[in-house]
Amino acid sequence: MIISIDKKELAEAVSSVSRFAERRSTTLPVLAGIVIVAGDDGIKLRATNLETGIDRKIQGTIKDPGVVALPANTLREITSSFNGSGQITLEHGGDTVVISSGTGRSTLKTLPYEDFPIIPFPEATAANFSISGSVLKNLIATVAPCASPSTVRPELGSVLIAAEGGTIKAVATDSFRLAEKKVSLPGVTTPFSFLIPAKNALDIIQTIPDETIEVRSDDNQCAFSCPSMMLTTRLVTIAYPDYTQIIPKSFVTEATLLRKDFEAALKRSAVFSDSFQKVRLGFSISEKRVSINAQNSDVGDSAESIPSSISGDEIELSFNHRYLTAPLSLISADSITLSACGIGRPLVIRGVGDASFLYLVMPMNQ
């Protein structure tokens, strides 16, 4: 195999494809590599860790077709180190590949590409729809941080993608907080739902372009494809909890305040939070203010008071300050609404005038 590819294009492609190679030690060495295929369909880069996989096309000149597998990390380091514009040539001979440009050359040992598994492309038996890549990225990125990092309950370490009635939504929760993001997708008329491991979902949205993406899934796999690439991920087959049961239908207290004021007050209060990251959130009906108090015996204490439009009962709840801050960067509205349900019950945060995003957080023990 002999191929020539633009330096910048190859470096970018290798960087994105290497994300899907196996990072841990494995009995199948080729899983830690990138397979380069040069043939009638052009040049393709492939990688899989058996959880996720990618098949990406790249522009270049094929002087001699062939297939080769190279260590992903080493190839990424080499291709990212070439400066300037111009072409990189890869020439395969025996068990090595010579990578050369106008300024230097490297000889890299190959991996046994014959062991590379087939990347599955699911039949569209469960879901089949098209969506803008930029919309899909925003949908998943908005909720994925709320997924649990633990592997004890795989469903809580996942992002739920579901559709019904022309609306598609993404949901994630770690049982302490929950985020739901909805967008209108009129072309979707058949209900569906599937669970993607949150880590896989984040790798996918860091890779797909902003153009139209076709999404299709069966019971075990989901694929995201466009003319330049195809990505797959295994699905979590455990049922997702019925989170709608915990979303409050009514509230005892509601306050509307400026998002930036709330964020700044939380940032200052965090300095004085205790080892549990706790701050106390108070709603004063008489003073029309939301208060944030924090105390740390080693540092000191703080008291913040934010003017608010407020109604309902006076109430005080304790929260992990990081969980209160997390949704604020995801809300574009200037003002937010804090809706409390009572002692020991969840707080709902929304942007004013934005029904597409909901964030729910459970209070800490008083």
Task: Put a short name on every predicted segment.
Residues M1-Q366:
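Structural preference for solvent-exposed beta-strand-turn elements
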